[in-house]
Amino acid sequence: QNLPGNDNSTATLCLGHHAVPNGTLVKTITNDQIEVTNATELVQSSSTGRICDSPHRILDGKNCTLIDALLGDPHCDGFQNEKWDLFVERSKAFSNCYPYDVPDYASLRSLVASSGTLEFINEGFNWTGVTQSGGSYACKRGSDNSFFSRLNWLYESESKYPVLNVTMPNNGNFDKLYIWGVHHPSTDKEQTNLYVRASGRVTVSTKRSQQTIIPNIGSRPWVRGLSSRISIYWTIVKPGDILLINSNGNLIAPRGYFKIRTGKSSIMRSDAPIGTCSSECITPNGSIPNDKPXQNVNKITYGACPKYVKQNTLKLATGMRNVPEKQTRGIFGAIAGFIENGWEGMXXGWYGFRHQNSEGTGQAADLKSTQAAIDQINGKLNRVIEKTNEKFHQIEKEFSEVEGRIQDLEKYVEDTKIDLWSYNAELLVALENQHTIDLTDSEMNKLFEKTRRQLRENAEDMGNGCFKIYHKCDNACIGSIRNGTYDHDVYRDEALNNRFQIKGVELKXGYKDWILWISFAISCFLLCVVLLGFIMVXCQKGNIRCNICI
């Protein structure tokens, strides 16, 4: 490309930055849409569609809920003593044993899920005077009537049901979880047939708590051929405490205890398949990468996950302001510096030089300023991800119907947190983008000022990011300017002489222009005088007559 006004005694040096034909629009504090050469998406908006089995230990509940597996529903026997980091409950899960309810279902489910194990220890409870291991046709184990494997249904023996008083100390150094229940017969006859007395009572106590349950006799909706129910309760016995069970009927007794562990295990409802892959972050939609600071896939997560935001996209600028190179630059096709536009095709760096001298034209990148900008931008992305990745999981929130107001409050708090974080994320990205553009502009200005200080009076700033050098500057001379070893004293006298000669020519060309304008003005004036004289002579001789009508 030709830089006009050059000859063998001068040279032109332009400074510029790279550009791309089609940049990416990002948001800054001062501008909703500004084009940059490159940007990185910060919001993960899609999942893999499957739950990865590594590095977390995933336990697929299949047809069983966690509570059914805990109680020992016959079709969930395969889950006995299992362990997990994440228990995945399926929508197809069902109960296939005696119909039951858990008054504090959500709390029990959460407690067992966070423990991460169904490890069970049998204990030798002494149930004297009653029949043990009752079963039901509604709970088949194979072809036999059966019951929950972790519970012991006690009923009359020889038409007697004595008052039961059983104690079990906790001599271990861990918490014990006991699951027990109360049977609610559908009729008074069923009550007396099973427990002799017309009304039973169950009391379970520790040093810290006591629960007394009176059975509610009455018919309920039929489930698996039964209108009676079992209510499931649970008691935690601390180390050094004692479990005391007192009952005169209707007791569904524990067979032992579950070990309670403290951990970060959890449970998630999902129908996504489990695949052989690795991902730190899991959502009900499937696993997602956690290399981005934010995600828009699902509010519920497990593992080290990006924060959930409402935005579908947030782009972090990882390049400089993009000013595409103009395809034509006047009739001479001259290039310009960074003030007018960027340069496309500069692959070796972000900033660089273009020159024209007696040896031709050339281009070279400035690696030092390029590296300075890249180092600062690379640090940005890593810091944003580091600050925003969750190191814990967002569990599902469940409440019973009687806790509806608490559920509404929880939902409001969660929605407010999401709104707040979404706003903060957008603001953070806008601030970082503004800083990125400012720092890349700053590196360009630093390089330009560094070049200006080297050239001093040997060159003139052309106002477009270029310098007109007033001495002969071959490729070696241009190279010294680029690498900072240029000695302006060596070329000072030559530059001053050339500058005066060139300015003198420009001055003479300026006088010529003035003379041309003055000559044109005088010619026009004389033409007007001649025309006016002709009109006056003609009027005197009567050749021209003017009539004025009023």
Swiss-Prot record:
InterPro entries: Capsid_hemagglutn (IPR008980), Hemagglutn_HA1_a/b_dom_sf (IPR013828), Hemagglutn_influenz_A (IPR000149), Hemagglutn_influenz_A/B (IPR001364). Residues 1-514 are extracellular. The chain crosses the membrane at residues 515-535. It is a single-pass type I membrane protein. Pfam families: Hemagglutinin (PF00509). A lipid is attached at C539, C546, C549 (S-palmitoyl cysteine). Glycans are attached at N8, N22, N38, N63, N126, N165, N285, N483. GO terms for biological process: clathrin-dependent endocytosis of virus by host cell; fusion of virus membrane with host endosome membrane; fusion of virus membrane with host plasma membrane; virion attachment to host cell. The keyword Lipid metabolism does not apply. The record marks R329, G330 as: Cleavage. Disulfide bonds join C14-C466, C52-C277, C64-C76, C97-C139, C281-C305, C473-C477. One of its GO terms (molecular function) is host cell surface receptor binding. The keyword Cell membrane does not apply. SUPFAM superfamilies: Influenza hemagglutinin (stalk), Viral protein domain. It comes from the Viruses. Coiled coil: none annotated. Homotrimer of disulfide-linked HA1-HA2. HAMAP family: INFV_HEMA (MF_04072). Major glycoprotein, comprises over 80% of the envelope proteins present in virus particle. Belongs to the influenza viruses hemagglutinin family. This is Hemagglutinin. It comes from Influenza A virus (strain A/Bangkok/1/1979 H3N2).
